[in-house]
């Protein structure tokens, strides 16, 4: 068959050196996350399909956990897990699938809906990246690519089928997926379908996490037309549906209702009736805790999440150094539906994103340029049910639109015979958000620069300066109505949202330096040794947080009001009366990352270390949601070359005692041991079969990751069988 340079480039990026390599491929190249097809492009950290099959992870965050300073946030439910990169997560990390942004974000719920079976590879950029992707990239970028027929066809075959069955013991997870694919000189097509079904999750020492069962199913269709050597078009459509019964806050273990909190208040004010007095916290301490618990109210709900995306790509790659063009048109739609189990109250959040990306690169004699324009329009529609019982005090539904236009430029300037490489970049974004009554608009300039010094053929240094920003989300702009409330002691206690017209975007300024040593044939012919060390410091200004407080007209002395009971001063308040999104924190995130790998024809040894410290620059107080430092060591060995490989990894998570003053919990250290094996012959009668086995948390440790609200997964045996023909 005859494929264009573009098609061949896509196919060759899949080649990996080791069937079970857990370490990052530091010298592989791809253009999804970096948006840069030039030969000087920055290399992101990458997880190949081979590595993903070996790990059998159930979420993107779990698949990336062995990368220094990339951790899991969101608890043990796979749907709620999100990557935490250098202390930042959620809507401070940009998610990209097939070159298209995924903007759905609802607090304490999932936003990574692509199943692992539909992921061909994952790339990670750590650190601010708004010069590439605009708003939101304070912590970094996670970019995923789904497969096409050219990825799966072997040996110039024109037709193929791939069948996979996976099983995991921790939650009786069954994963089934089937792909059918074909290609000729002009056309290629892929159709994939999957079905995943899991029971409640088992944690360490045999405990069960209630309400963690789920089902997920869906599919992917891709069509490609190679018009000629210079022109190619692709059309893809992806659709998934996720179902579970869980607390509306997917990050907590069990539901917490208004009624439960009200019972606690009544118990606190219950008279002794002649009994010996019990030790109680002060009323100030008690109601401070009540405020926190009301902010975490979460009812058990039936949840459904339909998610779909349609993308049209056009590639123009003539034999012209000035033209290497990519145009993408896309439409994403995500709907999050919830219905409370007891009362039947329904909620719905629907986000539709339409956009276009245009990118071109030009190679001049002494300079390389990448430049482009992005436009996207987000439309959000929400519904919030109410009743006179468990849903009396709810946030109001809101409908809003957002338009964002970004223009960016990346340059690579080699100097002194390419011993130095200067790579400045800049992006300008203009955005506006509007509802029926309010409209906001703003703009932001995001510069970045990188200087690489190739000292010798085995040593190079890189220094970076990157800026990023995150515009306030539509929820932060437009949420209104009641945050929480209750009827207690003969009165309604209601906390209401207050709009903030002066809300500013979050901004980040990151400095980092990296040293990279790499040797070939160091100890024996053909071996490779790599070691990389990075130090970074990211100063984030105007963090947006939800502030809960009393207004100036309200008596903040809850003691007097509580003591008065039903006859309390009507201007008093047991609970804070206002909630508002405010810019309240200037933070500094700093840390180090170390990676080392030694590889021979059959043996791979690797180790990595990551540590992030976060503090409020004004008060010096520790920040929340900073993962514990971790160090991992591992080995892979091909017992039978090109056929059977075994491996092991041991990871030590340090204790996390750096927590905010009002966070009463610290987290002890723990060690996890994982084993794995892969049977994947490259030739012979079983060359179409691949078997992966993994045993995670070998010693069934009971542990709780830092700032997680639930325990981690216990011993988990995983097996996966793939057969292709």
Swiss-Prot record:
GO cellular component: cell outer membrane
Presence of the UniProt keyword Cell inner membrane in the record: no
Keywords, alphabetical: Cell outer membrane, Membrane, Signal, TonB box, Transmembrane, Transmembrane beta strand, Transport
Molecular-function annotations in GO: heme transmembrane transporter activity; siderophore uptake transmembrane transporter activity
Region forming the signal peptide: 1-21
Source organism superkingdom: Bacteria
Entry membrane topology: Multi-pass membrane protein
Motif (TonB C-terminal box): 708-725
Subcellular localization: Cell outer membrane
A UniProt-annotated Pfam family: Plug
Sequence ranges assigned to domain TBDR beta-barrel in this UniProt record: 158-725
Domain TBDR plug residues, every copy: 36-147
Entries under PROSITE patterns matching the protein: TONB_DEPENDENT_REC_2 (PS01156), TONB_DEPENDENT_REC_3 (PS52016)
Role played: Required for utilization of free heme at low concentrations.
Annotated NCBIfam families: TonB-hemin, TonB-hemlactrns
UniProt family annotation: Belongs to the TonB-dependent receptor family.
Listed PANTHER family: HEME_HEMOPEXIN UTILIZATION PROTEIN C, TONB-DEPENDENT OUTER MEMBRANE RECEPTOR
Name by which UniProt lists this protein: Heme/hemopexin utilization protein C
Origin species: Haemophilus influenzae
Organism placement in taxonomy: Bacteria, Pseudomonadati, Pseudomonadota, Gammaproteobacteria, Pasteurellales
């Amino acid at each position: 068959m005859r494929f264009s340079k573009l098609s061949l480039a896509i196919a060759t990026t899949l080649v990996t050196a080791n069937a079970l390599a857990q370490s990052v491929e530091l010298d592989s190249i791809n253009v999804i996350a970096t948006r840069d097809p030039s030969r000087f492009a920055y290399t992101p950290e990458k997880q190949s399909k081979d590595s993903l099959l070996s790990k059998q992870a159930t979420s993107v965050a779990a698949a990336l956990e062995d990368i220094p300073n990339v951790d899991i946030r969101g608890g043990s439910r796979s749907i709620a897990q999100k990557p935490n990169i250098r202390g930042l997560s959620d809507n401070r990390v940009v998610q990209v699938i097939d070159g298209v942004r995924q903007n759905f974000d609802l607090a304490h719920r999932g936003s990574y809906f692509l199943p692992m079976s539909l992921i061909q590879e994952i790339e990670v950029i750590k650190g601010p990246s708004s010069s590439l992707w605009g708003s939101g990239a304070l912590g970094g970028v996670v970019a995923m690519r789904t497969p096409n027929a050219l990825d799966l066809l072997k040996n110039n075959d024109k037709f193929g089928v791939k069948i996979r069955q996976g099983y995991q013991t921790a939650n009786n997870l069954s994963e089934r997926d089937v792909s059918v694919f074909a290609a000729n000189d002009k056309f290629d097509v892929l159709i994939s379908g999957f079905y995943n079904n899991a029971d409640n999750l088992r944690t360490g020492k045999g405990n069960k996490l209630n309400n963690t069962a789920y089902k997920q199913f869906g599919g992917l269709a891709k069509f490609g037309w190679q018009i000629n050597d210079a022109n190619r078009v692709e059309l893809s459509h992806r659709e998934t549906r996720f179902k579970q019964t869980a607390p509306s806050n997917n990050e907590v273990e069990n539901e917490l209702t208004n009624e439960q909190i009200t019972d606690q208040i009544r118990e606190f004010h219950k008279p002794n009736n002649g009994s010996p007095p019990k030790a109680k916290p002060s009323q100030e301490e008690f109601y401070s805790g009540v405020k926190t618990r009301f902010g975490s109210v979460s009812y058990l709900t039936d949840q459904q999440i339909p998610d779909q995306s349609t993308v049209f790509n056009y590639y123009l790659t003539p034999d012209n150094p000035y033209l290497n063009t990519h145009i993408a048109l896309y439409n994403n739609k995500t709907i999050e539906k919830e219905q409370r189990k007891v009362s039947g109250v329904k909620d719905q959040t629907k986000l539709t994103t339409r956009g276009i990306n245009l990118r071109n690169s030009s190679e001049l004699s002494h300079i390389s340029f990448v430049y482009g324009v992005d436009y996207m329009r987000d439309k959000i529609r929400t519904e919030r049910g109410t009743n006179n019982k468990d849903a009396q005090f709810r946030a109001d539904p809101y409908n809003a639109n957002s338009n964002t236009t970004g223009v960016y430029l990346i340059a690579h300037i080699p100097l002194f015979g390419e011993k130095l490489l200067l790579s400045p970049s800049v992006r300008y974004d203009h955005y506006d958000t509007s509802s029926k009554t309010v409209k906001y608009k703003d703009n932001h300039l995001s510069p970045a620069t990188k200087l690489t010094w190739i000292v010798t053929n085995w040593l190079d240094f890189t220094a970076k300066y990157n800026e990023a920003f995150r515009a306030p989300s539509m929820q932060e702009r437009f949420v209104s109505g009641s945050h929480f409330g209750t009827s207690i002691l003969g009165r309604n206690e209601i906390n209401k949202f207050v709009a903030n017209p002066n809300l500013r975007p979050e901004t980040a300024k990151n400095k980092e330096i990296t040293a990279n040593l790499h040797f070939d044939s160091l100890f024996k012919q053909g071996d490779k040794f790599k070691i990389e060390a990075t130090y970074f410091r990211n100063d984030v200004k105007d963090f947006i947080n939800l502030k809960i407080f009393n207004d100036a007209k309200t008596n903040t002395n809850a003691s007097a009001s509580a003591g008065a009971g039903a006859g309390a001063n009507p201007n008093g308040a047991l609970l804070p009366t206002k909630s508002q999104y405010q810019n309240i924190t200037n933070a500094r995130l700093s840390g180090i990352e170390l990676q080392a790998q030694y590889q021979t024809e059959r043996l791979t040894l690797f180790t990595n270390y990551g540590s992030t410290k976060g503090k409020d620059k004004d008060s010096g107080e520790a920040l929340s949601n900073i993962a514990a430092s971790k160090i991992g060591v591992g080995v892979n060995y091909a017992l039978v070359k090109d056929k059977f490989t075994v491996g092991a990894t041991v990871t030590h998570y340090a204790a996390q005692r750096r927590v905010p003053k009002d966070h009463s919990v610290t987290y002890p250290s723990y060690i996890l041991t994982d084993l794995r094996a892969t049977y994947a012959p490259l030739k012979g009668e079983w060359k179409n079969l691949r078997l992966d086995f993994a045993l995670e948390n070998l010693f069934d440790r009971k542990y709780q990751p830092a700032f997680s609200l639930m325990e981690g997964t216990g011993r988990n045996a995983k097996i996966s069988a793939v057969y292709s023909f």
